[in-house]
Amino acid sequence: LEEDVGSGDITTNAIVPENKIAKAKIIAKEEGIIAGLPLAKLTYEVLDKKVRFISKVKDGCRVKSGTVIAEISGPARAILTGERLALNFLQHLSGIATLTNKFKAQSSKCKNKVEILDTRKTMPLWRGAEKYAVACGGGTNHRMGLYDAILIKDNHIAIAGGIEKAICKAQAQAQAKVRIEVEAKRISEVKEAIKIGVDRILLDNMNIKTLKQAVALCKKSKIKTEASGGVNLKNVAAIAKTGVDYISIGALTHSAKALDISLIML
């Protein structure tokens, strides 16, 4: 609100009488999964406590085009001033929830139980909200940041001098119950990681044939697997069929199209 309103909404204040009371409704203009209603409501609570915001659906619900998702009443100035920020929350987060749900639906076509994960590829200061939207769409949150799980990537491995050295250093420093995951790009790296022992192996940019081989090796050692890299709606079902436990998708948060949602004054 500080960023958008600044010293005041000079357009609304010039045109709308201060004592004008109005009503409005927020409508979904396309089918999708809703997320962000609490933030939209909070926008108006902070802006003007006289505004009444009533959610007509819940976050995580699928709506059709034309569905009224919220009704607003109160000072007209406040309704108009908060419109853009409230819609920004709803459109962006509902877009993430909707895309996540599409990936979940595609991956569910196979018998294997697989979880769709988000990543750290989020907008600065939006991570909590964007990961919440992923959950609303049926996805599962990966680590929240660099502090709650160890994920050894290719650059860590390069600096450490190899997978074995990187894993051993991580194991020596890791606190109890902190998950240790390592990235592997080829079968030889998978075998090396299995030999040393980790909680999960991230199978990065592997083709389907290699994924199947890697998953089979990991299952024998009871190590969880996560497929990542190049995942899209066309290939996610095939990736799920390999038997991986998780599929992480950066596009959920960095490439989701905003859901078309509008606020209409009554």
Where are these regions (language model features)?
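Cys/His-rich Zn2+-binding cysteine-cluster or related metal-binding knuckle/ribbon modules and their
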Residues: 233
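Acidic/glycine-rich phosphate/pyrophosphate-binding loops and surrounding catalytic core
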Residues: 1-185, 189-196, 200, 209-217, ...
